[in-house]
Regions:
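Hydrophobic/aromatic-rich alpha-helical bundle segments in the mid-to-C-terminal region
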Residues: 122, 142, 159-209, 217-233, ...
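Alpha-helical DNA-contacting segments of helix-turn-helix folds
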Residues: 67, 74-81
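Short secondary-structure transition hinges
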Residues: 112-150, 190
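Short hydrophobic/aromatic patch on the recognition helix
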Residues: 56-67
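Amphipathic alpha-helical packing segments from all-alpha helical-bundle domains
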Residues: 83-86, 91, 133-161, 171-175, ...
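Basic, helix-initiating cap at the start of DNA-binding domains
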Residues: 1-42, 46-58, 72-75
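Hydrophobic/aromatic residues within well-ordered alpha-helical segments
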Residues: 27, 70, 81, 85, ...
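Hydrophobic alpha-helical connector segments
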Residues: 76, 90-119, 167-174
Length: 238
């Protein structure tokens, strides 16, 4: 029986489909590692797809089967960084004493990772928001944005009664907070207010949005929602 089981396992390991899958995973790992190291060494603008394929030891045509262009390669690499930052922020937020502190804790790792390599961060934000609509790694990045916004909305609403009014306000606030993060991360390339500390400004703006959220949810929906037709969340719920 044991010999039969071992032979069965050997067959599965040597199965052509299994070997093909392992080869694909290995090539993707090599491409990811090559792209990550070259972007870190030279910066996004100074790296070519040929250099990445050479370092990964794959043909250029093979490289393009895993990522259609250099922008997708950057998204593939930096989605990993963004995802880790969101998870780190989730852990920090869980230890915060109140919703406002939790939101600030949640965004802190995103700001920190964005400062590790500002030029590449700017390129990542550009590809994330303005890349081709059908790019698969861009779709992964946008899903991470939605995850972050969902986390922020949940933190704002923690411990409070669930109402449509509060849910809409929390989603709006979460989107506004991501907009602040995006603006802060691309600020080095824009030269806006160079004398200001962008991270301190971002924290101040996030705190202001949080205060505005709590002020908003204390107002009756009929008073605050003078034109609900202008809000896509309300329209979608209808």
């Amino acid at each position: 029986m044991r010999g039969s089981a071992l032979r069965g396992n050997t067959l599965r390991v040597n199965d052509p489909v299994t070997r093909r899958l392992r080869n694909m995973q290995d090539k993707r790992r090599r491409i990811f590692t090559a792209a990550a190291s070259l972007f870190a060494e030279r910066g996004f603008d100074n790296v070519t797809t040929q250099a990445i394929s050479d370092r990964a030891d794959v043909a250029t045509g093979t490289l393009f089967r895993y990522a259609a262009n250099k922008g997708e390669l950057l998204l593939m690499v930096y989605n990993e960084e963004f995802g880790r930052a969101i998870n780190d922020g989730r852990g920090l937020a869980a230890r915060a004493v109140d919703p406002a502190a939790a939101v600030l804790a949640a965004v802190e790792p995103v700001l920190v990772v964005g400062r590790l390599d500002p030029p590449n961060t700017v390129a990542y934000q550009r590809e994330l928001l303005f890349g081709p609509p059908d790019a698969p790694y861009r779709a992964v990045g946008l899903a991470l944005v939605r995850d972050l916004e969902f986390l922020l909305a949940a933190l704002l609403s923690a411990g409070q009664p669930v109402t449509e009014h509060r849910a809409v306000a929390a989603r709006r606030a979460a989107r506004s907070i991501f907009a602040v993060l995006h603006h802060t991360l691309v600020q080095p390339s824009a030269g806006i207010l160079p004398e200001h500390d962008p991270d301190a400004d971002a924290r101040g703006q996030v705190a202001q949005i949080v205060l505005g959220f709590f002020a908003t949810v204390r107002v009756a929906p009929s008073e605050q929602e003078s034109d609900p037709q202008g809000d896509p969340d309300v329209l979608q719920q209808r």
